[in-house]
Amino acid sequence: MKWLGLTVAGMIAGFVTSSAQAQDISAGERLFKRHCGICHIAEKDSARRLQGPNLWGLVGRKAGTVEGFRYSDANKNSGIVWSAETLDPYLTDPREVIKGTTMAFVGVKKPDERKAIIEYLAAQK
């Protein structure tokens, strides 16, 4: 009986964690659309084009490398590989992180919103 109780407790904990992660992704998607969606999409194999590049598979990718998109020399030569650690300061103030970027975005000032957007982007793979 004790094992059954532990099993059920473990299942509930797993469900709560999965549910919380799904909520974070959902919040991140909403924030992505609000802050980034005017210029970017994050869609697998999409031919749809907006002002900015498709951000599907962004985490782990080198900055300035989406084929067919014209990047500034600053972006192409930044040497940045996108991760939570590089995205957070970039989403705070892109022009401070990559001086000379052509991205016209003032940044996301709230840390919890940046975190949610980064978690959403990390899941788009």
In which residue ranges do the predicted regions lie?
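Sec/Tat signal peptide C-region and signal peptidase I cleavage site
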Residues: V16-D24
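Pocket-edge structural micro-motifs
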Residues: V59, A84, G107
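Short, exposed beta-strand-loop hairpins at the edges of beta-sheets
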Residues: V106-P111, A116-Q124
